[in-house]
Amino acid sequence: MKDLTKYCGVIPAFYACYDAEGNISTEGAKALTRHLIAKGAKGFYVGGSSGECIYQHPDERKKLLEAVMSEAKGKITVIAHVGCNNTADSVELAAHAESVGVDAIASIPPIYFHLPEYAIAKYWNDMSAAAPNTEFVIYNIPQLAGTGLTMSLLKEMLKNPNVIAVKNSSMPTQDIQMFKDAGIAARGEGNFVVFNGPDEQFVYGRVIGADGGLGGTYAVMPEGYLAMNGNTNKSENEAARAIQYERALILYKLCEA
């Protein structure tokens, strides 16, 4: 039985770090790693949307992950997003992530074309096979990927024992409940994790069953999300809602720009 408690909590999406010339800043990545560890984050999600994964060369993604791991290994949970717009690069990044010692790899589905479910499953399973000793997280973000995680596809992926979680960034919190129920049905209580993705609904996702959150603004205001998580764990829902409301107003202002 896997111990998945290392994934339960507040996991900031790690930001892309560049120097003044637009190159990957390893020193910036190391500094951000140390900062977020000091703040009390449960882990990091490296190379995802906030890490500008789709815009980076695989070598840049490797370089940033190596910088993070040089500071984080053995101290904090690290999930590396390895999805690319082709299987070969995705597989290469998966193998690299395992070689540097991440806790899990993750991936969005193939983007642009709406591929059949068997093709999406093969894409994910090929990555997982390239990192056979590393756990796998499905990243569901249909509004950007163009393809959503269906229950039939999730059930197919649950045949892979390394698939231990879904990061759910769709807006309906009902999806969290459905994915969680499917995971429990297949694996048993405590053996499947669902992350809340949308920052503006952290509390609502946790209340309906998410084990933690994985979001893009956690790294700039971690204290609020850590407080919300603590409130939710103690069923202090009024306090949690108050912080959530404040954070949501900040997000709405950011989105107005």
Where are the regions that the model predicts?
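Active-site beta->alpha loop and helix N-cap motifs at the rims of alpha/beta catalytic domains
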Residues: 2-148
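Short amphipathic alpha-helical segments at helix boundaries and their inter-helical linkers
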Residues: 43, 256-257
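Catalytic alpha/beta core domains of metabolic enzymes, predominantly
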Residues: 129-130, 142-256
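Polar low-complexity intrinsically disordered regions
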Residues: 1, 13, 99, 233-242
